[in-house]
């Protein structure tokens, strides 16, 4: 790990207050689980020399897309972490998703897999498996899971702590993790140890059947039904848009209408408009105004904007996005702009 250095900066800073739970092997999550994937992204996407064993070109091609924006990560304590990124989006939730620091499997499973790949037993990617004529690793295949279990047993015997977790995980903590994952793999015959609401009970490749069971651990932070509000997306939709088809250059004009969200008249949304001339050059843009909480809106376009319009057709686009779902509804219309007879007479 390297320090931030001097005079480094980032466009965006995101702080996460992490909700931990137990892994499905019974071990509580901690920051070591979050740190290991960070290490892995950098280690396996960078090639020091031609004999570098911790490099996968297919993985690197995917990881580098995000890594070029990541400036650093800082853990304030075990569950509070700050991510520094050179990334911006008009929706803060998109930034939070982009910069997230999370783990989908325990660090000890990832470390065991890494050792197996470095030793040429498996490959992380399909392309490397083909090039090296070895198997492409899958956590759900029984023989692969047993290889991971055997590697975990070696790590326990060696009292191994990954270099990336030095001074973060003690030997005793590591052995406790190894024991838990060894037991899990022995009992379940696969190595998919998650932290979500469902766990894989068994897998029958011959019958193409996977059986899931609910993970009812008391540490899981979301009660039953917590996510039900997302079963039906509350998308915004233009129900009615009214505007004059023919307008006079230099005179104000208004667009009005109504929006529904999830089928109900609601104003909990963002409304944006854009107006273009006949050459598709942007004339003006702005935010619409909600008249009430029933989805009725008004867009006032001043005379300066209409004066900049082309004689003839000018296109406008309306975008409405509910605050419950990101996908916008789009409405397009045409203003036919005609000269102002008074202004023409004065000239």
Residue ranges and their predicted role:
Residues 1-347:
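The feature preferentially marks the first beta-strand/turn patch immediately downstream
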